[in-house]
């Protein structure tokens, strides 16, 4: 009986995914990855010379400021980048 109860607890923890995990796209190639603890934003990085094609995607803790050469777009939902 204890084994059954322990099994149910383990299955519940695995299914509920205790501790929300954010999933962000990464580049290259486009695929998603689970962000580590503390990195709760997804980002896209563009070169200012071509704002149509992102050059980098991933997880980040703080959205960087844009510069003369690089623009960042950050968001906080799964695969939003």
From Swiss-Prot:
<protein>
    <recommendedName>
        <fullName>Cytotoxin 1a</fullName>
    </recommendedName>
</protein>
<keyword id="KW-0732">Signal</keyword>
<comment type="similarity">
    <text>Belongs to the three-finger toxin family. Short-chain subfamily. Type IA cytotoxin sub-subfamily.</text>
</comment>
<feature type="disulfide bond">
    <location>
        <begin position="24"/>
        <end position="42"/>
    </location>
</feature>
<dbReference type="GO" id="GO:0044218">
    <property type="term" value="C:other organism cell membrane"/>
</dbReference>
<dbReference type="InterPro" id="IPR003572">
    <property type="entry name" value="Cytotoxin_Cobra"/>
</dbReference>
<keyword id="KW-0204">Cytolysis</keyword>
<dbReference type="InterPro" id="IPR003571">
    <property type="entry name" value="Snake_3FTx"/>
</dbReference>
<keyword id="KW-1053">Target membrane</keyword>
<feature type="disulfide bond">
    <location>
        <begin position="75"/>
        <end position="80"/>
    </location>
</feature>
<keyword id="KW-1015">Disulfide bond</keyword>
<comment type="subunit">
    <text>Monomer in solution; Homodimer and oligomer in the presence of negatively charged lipids forming a pore with a size ranging between 20 and 30 Angstroms.</text>
</comment>
<keyword id="KW-0472">Membrane</keyword>
<feature type="disulfide bond">
    <location>
        <begin position="35"/>
        <end position="59"/>
    </location>
</feature>
<dbReference type="InterPro" id="IPR018354">
    <property type="entry name" value="Snake_toxin_con_site"/>
</dbReference>
<feature type="disulfide bond">
    <location>
        <begin position="63"/>
        <end position="74"/>
    </location>
</feature>
<dbReference type="GO" id="GO:0005576">
    <property type="term" value="C:extracellular region"/>
</dbReference>
<keyword id="KW-0123">Cardiotoxin</keyword>
<keyword id="KW-0800">Toxin</keyword>
<dbReference type="GO" id="GO:0016020">
    <property type="term" value="C:membrane"/>
</dbReference>
<dbReference type="GO" id="GO:0031640">
    <property type="term" value="P:killing of cells of another organism"/>
</dbReference>
<keyword id="KW-0964">Secreted</keyword>
<dbReference type="Pfam" id="PF21947">
    <property type="entry name" value="Toxin_cobra-type"/>
</dbReference>
<comment type="function">
    <text>Shows cytolytic activity on many different cells by forming pore in lipid membranes. In vivo, increases heart rate or kills the animal by cardiac arrest. In addition, it binds to heparin with high affinity, interacts with Kv channel-interacting protein 1 (KCNIP1) in a calcium-independent manner, and binds to integrin alpha-V/beta-3 (ITGAV/ITGB3) with moderate affinity.</text>
</comment>
<dbReference type="InterPro" id="IPR054131">
    <property type="entry name" value="Toxin_cobra-type"/>
</dbReference>
<feature type="signal peptide">
    <location>
        <begin position="1"/>
        <end position="21"/>
    </location>
</feature>
<dbReference type="GO" id="GO:0090729">
    <property type="term" value="F:toxin activity"/>
</dbReference>
<keyword id="KW-1052">Target cell membrane</keyword>
<dbReference type="InterPro" id="IPR045860">
    <property type="entry name" value="Snake_toxin-like_sf"/>
</dbReference>
């Amino acid at each position: 009986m204890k084994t059954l109860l322990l099994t149910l607890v383990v299955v519940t923890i695995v299914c509920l995914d205790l501790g929300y995990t954010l999933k962000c796209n990464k580049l290259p190639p486009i695929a998603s990855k689970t962000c580590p603890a503390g990195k709760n934003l997804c980002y896209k990085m563009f070169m200012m010379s071509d704002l149509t094609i992102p050059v980098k995607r991933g997880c980040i803790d703080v959205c960087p400021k844009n510069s003369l050469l690089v623009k960042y777009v950050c968001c906080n939902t799964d695969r939003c980048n």
